[in-house]
């Protein structure tokens, strides 16, 4: 079945200024780790075909069918605020673009070996980082947040040196685009303005085709990216997601979450939470993500400056905050069960965040329990499950806030049971805590089995519904294991 996939390798047609043809370096003795059935459905292929010997060989670099056109894409980027003039795909290859019933998707092989852009790297990916990206794509899709996906993970017998010796692996990423803000920066800063325009025209054709050959199409591209980025980061903030490395080379031109490295979902609420322990100064802390999104868009606008009208570009960038705020407020009111705006809502929500921070409440658990809170039994329905029996005394102010909140919620002209049900569709039971991801990784490394990975992936795929025999993923880890910061090592 994989032999009959329809590829349209349009990026390859742009030429050698944009990417370099490279064949993947095969994994030694490849073995399948996992396959995501939802991504198979997205692509219109069977899970069995991916799991077959032929599929494992294709997605481990051991077999390159004629439909593939493996490319290492060139790009640059601002990393932690400093410009890096040439980055590019140092260990990943765009295998091709697959036409499906739901649109065109890139297939990208992470861990494909050295490329001209590897610099001092070995081009491999480790199993740990591939498992983390696999789970992240499933989790974000389950939450309804634009994201890349992972089709499968394959491990090999190759040993890779990071902080320790780890097994090599490949991950087949599926995304609507791998064009990054840094793709445009590369051509701008090298003064290759002809290629810059070619890339911009290509992006217009692929993602906003209604503007092809029209005046102002490049301003339309900037506005489109601004809008999609604002909505994406609003969604991150609403679920407590921290990306960790919001460099411009990790920002998708179409506003999908891309390049899952040292990410983390916030556990105990802390607006200044840092998930990447290499982020010494907190540039990419949770509360900085909205402003960094705008910073990155300004960098993109600078890269597009030879092609765009400055006043229109300024207007697009100035629209960012309003778009983000509107999207964030929409998501938060759904989490709170508010169907309409009322006077006093802003103060009520502000007090809520103060309580969350002061009591270090678990962000995901708080909102899920809030849907179940009952005015006539606040202690047992909300306070005790949230704080635990030993900490109820600390919840006096929280109980007062919850009573005020429930009074406000009752102003909605629908039955409370309906509101509770709706809140449960917007507040997940399960979130991808780094502690859980590490359990899956430990089992894979120590035992060579993947039962925790499979079970965790299943609950993350449908996070708003209770899963039998998965209660271990419903509650936060011990406090000393919460909010684990991880590194960029992968």
From Swiss-Prot:
Pfam families: SelO. The gene is ydiU. Its EC number is 2.7.7.-, 2.7.7.108. ATP binds at residues 88, 90-91, 110, 122-123, 173, 180, 259. Nucleotidyltransferase involved in the post-translational modification of proteins. It can catalyze the addition of adenosine monophosphate (AMP) or uridine monophosphate (UMP) to a protein, resulting in modifications known as AMPylation and UMPylation. Its cofactor is Mg(2+); Mn(2+). It comes from Saccharophagus degradans (strain 2-40 / ATCC 43961 / DSM 17024). GO terms for molecular function: AMPylase activity; ATP binding; magnesium ion binding. It catalyses: L-seryl-[protein] + ATP = 3-O-(5'-adenylyl)-L-seryl-[protein] + diphosphate; L-threonyl-[protein] + ATP = 3-O-(5'-adenylyl)-L-threonyl-[protein] + diphosphate; L-tyrosyl-[protein] + ATP = O-(5'-adenylyl)-L-tyrosyl-[protein] + diphosphate; L-histidyl-[protein] + UTP = N(tele)-(5'-uridylyl)-L-histidyl-[protein] + diphosphate. It comes from the Bacteria. This is Protein nucleotidyltransferase YdiU. NCBIfam families: PRK00029.1. The active site is at 249 (proton acceptor). It is an enzyme of class 2 (transferase). Keywords: ATP-binding, Magnesium, Manganese, Metal-binding, Nucleotide-binding, Nucleotidyltransferase, Transferase. Mg(2+) binds at residues 250, 259. Belongs to the SELO family.
């Amino acid at each position: 079945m994989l032999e009959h996939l329809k590829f349209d390798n349009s990026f390859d047609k742009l030429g050698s200024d944009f990417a370099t043809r490279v064949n993947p370096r095969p994994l030694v003795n490849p073995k399948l780790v996992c396959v995501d059935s939802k991504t198979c459905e997205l692509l219109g292929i069977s899970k069995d075909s991916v799991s077959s010997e032929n599929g494992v060989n294709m997605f481990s670099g051991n077999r390159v069918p004629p439909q593939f056109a493996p490319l290492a894409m060139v790009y640059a980027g601002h990393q932690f605020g400093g410009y890096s003039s040439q980055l590019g795909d140092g260990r990943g290859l765009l295998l091709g673009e697959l036409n499906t019933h739901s649109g065109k998707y890139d297939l990208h092989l992470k861990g494909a070996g050295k490329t001209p852009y590897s610099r001092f790297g070995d081009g491999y990916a480790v199993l740990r980082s591939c498992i983390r990206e696999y789970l992240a794509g499933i989790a974000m899709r389950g939450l309804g947040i634009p994201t890349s996906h992972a089709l499968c993970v394959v491990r090999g017998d190759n040993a890779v040196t990071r902080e320790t010796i780890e097994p090599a692996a490949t991950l087949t990423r599926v995304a609507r685009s791998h064009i990054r803000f840094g793709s445009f920066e590369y051509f701008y800063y090298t003064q290759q303005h002809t290629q810059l325009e070619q890339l911009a025209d290509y992006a217009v054709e692929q993602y906003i085709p209604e503007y092809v050959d029209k005046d102002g199409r490049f301003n339309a591209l900037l506005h489109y990216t601004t809008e999609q980025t604002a909505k994406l980061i609003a969604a991150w903030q609403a679920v407590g997601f921290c990306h960790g490395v919001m460099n411009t080379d990790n920002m998708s031109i179409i506003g999908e979450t891309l390049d899952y490295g040292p990410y983390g979902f916030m556990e105990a609420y802390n607006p200044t939470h840092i998930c990447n322990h290499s982020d010494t100064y907190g540039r990419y802390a949770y509360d900085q993500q909205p402003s960094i999104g705008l910073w990155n868009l300004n960098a993109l606008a600078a890269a597009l400056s030879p092609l765009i009208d400055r006043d229109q570009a300024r207007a697009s960038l100035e629209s960012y905050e309003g778009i983000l705020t509107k999207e964030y407020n929409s998501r938060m009111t759904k989490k709170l069960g508010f169907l309409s705006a009322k006077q006093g809502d802003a103060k009520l929500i502000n007090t809520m965040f103060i309580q969350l921070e002061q009591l270090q409440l678990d962000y995901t658990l708080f909102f899920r329990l809030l849907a179940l809170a009952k005015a006539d039994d606040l202690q047992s329905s909300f306070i005790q499950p949230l704080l635990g029996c030993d900490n109820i005394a600390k919840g006096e102010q929280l109980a007062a806030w919850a009573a005020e909140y429930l009074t406000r919620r009752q102003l909605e002209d629908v039955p409370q049971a309906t509101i509770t049900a709706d809140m449960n569709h917007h507040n997940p039971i399960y979130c991808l805590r780094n502690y859980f991801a590490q359990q899956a990784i430990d089992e894979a490394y120590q035992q060579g089995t993947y039962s925790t990975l499979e079970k965790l992936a299943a609950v993350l795929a449908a996070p708003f519904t209770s899963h039998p025999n998965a209660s271990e993923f419903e509650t936060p880890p011990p406090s000393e294991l919460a909010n684990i910061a991880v590194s960029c090592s992968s």
